[in-house]
């Protein structure tokens, strides 16, 4: 696709690929504009590595009985070096989520240690808990985190290069849009817990 259509790529969702089961490493790596890749199951490490404009969705199987936001669904180093595109993750991601992300947008229901490490751009909306050392070396981009899920402890956030800001209407509009998309793609029940009434529960 990149060879034929170049940097411009194809319109969003031109080619939709659906998978089931357990994917190996690097599912959706370097996926380009126009692709939509959806897997009902789980993925391993390096999910969305170098994402370059595609939309990636990983969701729990329809017949699953467990709570998605309490279980890991993708491995470590998801979205490593992503430059653009979107990812909707119906569960918890492992360590180093969005490391070196420079432009992709991601919604996830929890992350392990070192989340958003060295992130320089893009958006991460985290609907669950974060691990230790969040935002180490993060020099750009935005992470939205719900306070009710996370204690403000010295080992939770690496404050060397980040600051918290008061959210404005634009932020709330972004969050609302991402929640609607996440629900549309994954039917995650956790989205129903976060309405506009929960706006004061956010850290930015």
Over which residues does each language-model region extend?
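Short, T/G/N/S-enriched strand-turn elements that build extracellular solenoid repeat scaffolds
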Residues: 2-8, 25-31, 43-51, 76-79, ...
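Detector for repetitive beta-architecture
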Residues: 14-16, 34-36, 53-55, 84-86, ...
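Feature marks extracellular polysaccharide-active and adherence modules
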Residues: 20, 30, 38-42, 50, ...
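Acidic/polar low-complexity surface segments
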Residues: 54-78
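Terminal amphipathic helices with adjacent charged low-complexity linkers/tails
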Residues: 147-167
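N-terminal leader/propeptide and maturation segments of large enzyme subunits in energy/redox metabolism
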Residues: 166-171, 175-193
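Conserved small/polar residues in nucleotide/adenosyl-binding loops
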Residues: 194-199
């Amino acid at each position: 696709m990149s060879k034929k259509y170049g940097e411009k790529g194809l319109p969003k969702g031109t080619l939709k690929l659906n998978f089931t089961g357990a994917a190996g490493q690097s599912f959706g790596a370097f996926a380009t504009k126009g692709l939509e890749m959806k897997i009902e199951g789980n993925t391993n490490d390096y999910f969305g590595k170098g994402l370059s404009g595609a939309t990636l969705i990983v969701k729990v199987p329809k017949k699953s009985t467990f709570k998605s936001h309490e279980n890991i669904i993708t491995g470590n180093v998801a979205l490593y070096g992503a430059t653009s595109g979107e990812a909707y993750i119906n569960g918890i991601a492992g360590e180093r989520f969005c490391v070196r992300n420079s432009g992709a947008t991601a919604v996830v229901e929890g992350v392990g240690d070192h989340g958003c490490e060295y992130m320089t751009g893009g958006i991460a909306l985290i609907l669950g808990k974060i691990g230790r050392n969040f935002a180490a070396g993060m020099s750009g981009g935005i992470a939205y985190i719900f306070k009710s899920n996370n204690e403000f402890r010295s080992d939770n956030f690496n404050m060397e290069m980040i600051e918290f800001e008061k959210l404005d209407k634009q932020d709330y509009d972004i969050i609302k849009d991402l929640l609607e998309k996440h629900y549309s793609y994954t039917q995650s029940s956790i989205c129903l817990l976060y309405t506009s009434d929960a706006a004061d529960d956010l850290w930015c």
